[in-house]
A protein has these predicted regions:
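Extended acidic/charged loop-beta regions that coordinate divalent cations
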Residues: 84, 88, 127-176, 207-245
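ATP-dependent carboxylate-amine ligase catalytic core
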Residues: 12, 26-28, 32-49, 73-159, ...
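Charged, amphipathic alpha-helical linker segments immediately N-terminal to NTP-binding catalytic cores
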Residues: 1-27
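Beta-strand->loop->alpha-helix junctions that form or flank phosphate-binding loops
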Residues: 81-84, 200-202, 214-231, 248-252, ...
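C-terminal helical cap/extension that packs against the catalytic core
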Residues: 199-217, 232-235, 266, 298-299, ...
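Membrane-proximal helix-turn-helix segments that form the acceptor-binding/catalytic region
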Residues: 185-194
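A conserved segment at the C-terminal end of the G1
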Residues: 50-54, 62-79
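Nucleotide phosphate-binding/pyrophosphate-handling subdomain across enzymes
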Residues: 48-50, 137, 142-147, 154-165, ...
Length: 422
């Protein structure tokens, strides 16, 4: 008899996601043994002839997007797995920079459900297996995997990377990864492989990353030592052991991440022309990362949710021509460094619009206000955003930040407004 509690291949995606959220006893359960067993049964441990794996506290998404953009410009068929999503689950898997239909995801979930037997999987492990299965079906040239949490014990690390990338190291997820940059660096370097390039974009690299590279006999390529970049006026220059690339176009993604992606591409040995590099760098853009949505007032969406990302965001804001005020809509998760994140932003924000985030991890607006001397409390992200937009004059900037969830809420409200107006 059919088990009504387990969705089928033809079930709606929402039914599957609800099922996956309640499948495992723990939301996060670090370790590769269970998920690797199921991956072996599905034969997805080699999802493509060439694999990049990208870890790091911040900058993973834009580094992956730059890799994808340049490789596609060079003629490769590329798949990207990233998380979390902003609005739709299907954002997590891209093939040739396009999302797949929900039916493809539900078909993959049904395959995993059949293969896992009695093995319990977390939501993220299920999603990772699904991405690998979808990539295998698509017969790709290159797959780019964004690590979910850490590196060493993350589900993506069941796949052997041909090039491993660590974008940056800062304090985040300390409950899982350790209390300092050295312990976090060791976890992230767990994606390194013997005799394979290990590209590090963090300029202040923890010693543990070099230790792991030595232990694993990985080929460490460090920013500022083995490769470097320099921004000049309206162009930039990249150099490594292979030589220099001059007069590169400035990227739309953060400069360090574009440079890290370029270092990884050049270390890969894949054939990529200089023209593909130039075209790919110019075309790479990722929603929610210093995304300027509109002007008058200027609306900027950024998922910055820790001090490292907030400091970068503050710097970007300072680099813009100063016109009016900066009104910030903020919602955060309570397990983040709220005080440290807001402190990095206080010098550039004139007025705060504090909103709670739903769910057990969401911080209340009152918790945010404890760290701020100025601002107002609202009952939802949507209400805070509407209030900020109503208060903003044409010369002002409205910034939405603090979490993927905060940005996603505003994007959904904006989409609903556009749809409602049709």
């Amino acid at each position: 008899m059919e088990n009504k509690s387990i969705p089928q291949a033809t079930s709606p995606l929402a039914a599957w996601l609800s099922y996956l959220e309640n499948l495992h006893s723990k939301t996060i359960d670090m370790g590769l043994e269970r998920v690797s067993q199921v991956a072996a049964r599905l034969d997805v441990l080699k999802p493509a002839p060439f694999v990049f794996t990208v870890a790091g506290t911040n900058g993973k998404g834009t580094t992956c997007r730059t890799l994808e953009s340049v490789l596609m410009a060079a003629g490769y068929k590329v798949g990207v797995y990233c998380s979390p999503h902003l609005v739709r689950y299907t954002e997590r898997v891209r093939v040739q920079n396009s999302e797949l239909p929900e039916s493809a995801h539900t078909a993959s979930f049904a395959e995993i459900e059949a293969a896992r037997g009695e093995i319990s999987l977390t939501y993220f492990e299920y999603g990772t297996l699904s991405a690998l299965w979808l990539f295998k079906q698509a017969q790709l040239d290159v797959v780019i995997l964004e690590v979910g949490l850490g590196g060493r014990l993350d589900a993506t690390n069941m796949v052997d990377a041909d090039v491993a990338v660590v974008t940056s190291i800062a304090l985040d997820h300390i409950d899982w990864l350790g209390p300092d940059r050295e312990s976090i660096g060791r976890e992230k370097a767990g994606i390194f492989r013997a005799n394979k390039p290990a590209v590090v974009g963090e300029p202040d690299m923890p010693h543990t990353i070099a230790d792991v590279a030595n232990e694993k006999s990985a080929r460490l390529l460090r920013r500022g030592v083995d490769w470097q970049y320099e921004v000049q006026e309206n162009v930039w220059r990249f150099s490594d052991a292979q030589g220099a690339l001059d007069n590169l176009p400035l990227p739309q993604v953060p400069q360090p991440n574009a440079a890290t992606a370029l270092a990884a591409l050049r270390a890969s040995g894949l054939a990529v022309s200089e023209q593909a590099i130039r075209d790919g760098i110019q075309q790479a853009i990722l929603p929610g990362r210093f995304l300027i949505v509109s002007e008058s007032p200027r609306l900027i969406l950024d998922v910055a949710h820790n001090p490292h990302a907030a400091a970068y965001l503050a710097g970007r804001l300072k680099s813009l021509p100063k016109t009016g005020r900066v009104l910030a809509v903020i919602g955060m998760l309570h397990d983040k460094d709220i005080g440290g994140t807001l402190a990095c932003m206080e010098s550039v924000v004139d007025s705060w619009y504090c909103a709670p985030l739903e769910g057990p991890r969401g911080a209340t607006a009152e918790q945010l206000m404890e760290h701020l001397g100025k601002g107002a409390i609202y009952s939802s992200v949507a209400q805070a955003w509407h209030a900020a937009m109503a208060d903003a004059k044409p010369e002002d900037t409205v910034l939405v930040c603090g979490s993927f969830h905060t940005v996603a809420h505003v994007m959904e409200v904006m989409d609903a407004g556009r749809t409602g107006g049709e």
